[in-house]
Amino acid sequence: MVVKVSLDVGTILKQYERSKAKKAPYDSFILEMLQYLCPRLSNKVSGRIASGSKQTTLQFDSAGEDAGQKLAASLSGTLISPSQKWFRLVPREYALRALPAFMRWLEECGDRLYAAFNNSNLSMEAAESFLSLVYIGTDAMLHEEAAAKRIGEFGGFRFRTLGFGEYCYEEDMFGMVNKLYRSFDTTYGAAAEIPGWIEKMPTEAQNKVRNSPEEEFEVVHVVYPRTSYNRRQSDFLNMPFGSCYIMTRTRVLLDEGGFNEFPYAVTRWAKSPGEIYGRGPGHRAYPDVRSQNRLAELELEAGSKAVDPTLLVLHEAIMGDATLNPAGINAIDGQMVGNDVRRAVMPLESGANFQWTVDKLERLEKKIRQAFHNDHLIVPEKPDMSATEFAGRQEVMQRMIGSTFGRIYVEKLAIIVNRGFAMMERAGAFPPPPPIPQQYVGTAIDIVFEGPLARAQRSHDLIAIQRKNEWLTGQMNLGNTSAIDLFDADQEGREMAEITGLPANLVRDPDEVAGIRKAKAAAAKQQQGMEQLTEALKGAGAAAPALDRLPRTARKVDSAFANAGAGS
């Protein structure tokens, strides 16, 4: 049975208007912030800005924008690196982790998934996404499958970061975004190229396709969780998440489809109680950025007065009109100035305290960089920095924004990897899995993030192992050789391989390890037997002269017994 999905366009648009109204206060404040922090992100937050127009009217100092871009670039390059694999797939069942064939299959799947990410526009869109997350505290990224070049092939991924003014959303009972409205403008000509749209447009709109193809109209795309659908059907109308495009002007449903997973990764830096939109470092830095810009504006005004000051001119001391042009000549009445021509024109000193302004600006800039965590994420250029000092900086960084990384992992990275894995699995882009015990069929696959920051968060176990080895070395030096029996060296090696992200093909199968050890034991036993035989042969060689003399001695003894018998 196919479930008939009926959509009430009017109800959807009313829900969209309510959601947009709840977001309006955020839009107003975010627009005010972005004019000082990152003006280029302010487009479409509250109306569209004309293309090519000036955006830095209120910005007199770029310290806030510079600090935010450094944080965003650091997060993007560290968490989603195009040059270093930033995630690993592992089975949730620990028993499966001891099966090298299965682990190699998961590693192959992870490598193919990572290659698909690198072949897409993820790195480019992730950089924009982290900018929104840093300045605004909220970002949304659309994750779709790209069109395949040939039928039956996997087409790859396509990502798009949404501007803050393009969308509004709703949360489920667990605080995760599960419904998103995206508003965008398109032309009638572009809409006519989308299959099925022009047939559903009213007659007036179809006429504009022919007569005014460049005219734009608004479309709302909503993705929502379906409450009623047939899980046995695989068509678009029976997927967990519904999708529909609505022409708002005519209230016409242009297209209806679905997704197997929610296609948007909506991330919040942090949330205030009762709010669904995030707040980030930009909110914390904004008061200082606003003060810094105002102080920089006043400093420029004071500087202009110092460079080109107001002049005090003695009344009627200059004969004719005064000129301030280079190489200009002014006739001075000597009697009026007492033959001191400098008294005729004098600058008006403002008495501005420029040093106070410089000190205040430096203090504000330091606070702004602290708000954007530049002191923790950006490693200073220090060639003599030791590994211990670098590890210490990573630990401080982890403590300062560790909770934020947790939100990024859950709301962005895990959603991207999970959806990407599911899309490639459905498309047959992975090799067939190896056989596993029946009780583990259908086990869950977990994601382990492998970026430098993620490894820093797991480095405590590695440090504990290193400290144990130092202690064990000391015990061995003291003659306590039995201390080594307390630890499982094989399990320790596997733990270190997992913590450091060692490729699975470098870790041997337990059966293979047992075979190698058995062969070594047999070889050692054979070697021991050869050594014993050699020692025996050496002993036999030393006894040969004595054996050679044995017959002669025996003959002498026999003669002695014979003579004794004759005498009796």
Residue ranges and their predicted role:
Residues 30, 75-76, 125-134, 219, ...:
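Generic hydrophobic, helix-prone segments enriched in Leu/Val/Ile
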Residues 104-105, 112, 263, 339-340, ...:
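Short, flexible segments with low predicted structural confidence
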